[in-house]
């Protein structure tokens, strides 16, 4: 969700990473399809 919502501003990867960090992951990234993928 974070990737699609902020894609127009160019901060989708940061929002996705923060979302993952809050969930206890080390970070995350957006796929080409706009899906946020968290790292373990």
From Swiss-Prot:
Q: What induces it?
A: By injury to the larval cell wall.
Q: Which GO terms describe its biological process?
A: defense response to Gram-positive bacterium; humoral immune response; innate immune response
Keywords assigned by UniProt, alphabetized = Antibiotic, Antimicrobial, Defensin, Disulfide bond, Immunity, Innate immunity, Secreted
Q: Does this UniProt record's set of keywords contain Secreted?
A: yes
Q: Which residues form a coiled coil?
A: none
Give the tissue specificity: Hemocytes and fat body.
- Stored InterPro entries: Defensin_invertebrate/fungal (IPR001542), Scorpion_toxin-like_sf (IPR036574)
Keyword check for Secreted? yes
> Would you name any one GO CC term?
extracellular space
Disulphide bonds annotated for this chain are: 3-30, 16-36, 20-38
Compartments in which it is found: Secreted
Please explain the role this protein plays, according to its UniProt record.
Answer: Sapecins, which are potent bactericidal proteins, are produced in response to injury. Sapecin C is cytotoxic to Gram-positive bacteria.
The record's similarity note reads: Belongs to the invertebrate defensin family. Type 1 subfamily.
Spell out the PANTHER family in the cross-references: DEFENSIN
Q: What is the protein named?
A: Sapecin-C
Lineage, highest ranks first: Eukaryota, Metazoa, Ecdysozoa, Arthropoda, Hexapoda
């Amino acid at each position: 969700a974070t990737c699609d919502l902020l894609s127009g501003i160019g901060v989708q990867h940061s929002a996705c990473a923060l979302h993952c960090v809050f969930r206890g992951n080390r970070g995350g990234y957006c796929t080409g399809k706009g899906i946020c993928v968290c790292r373990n």
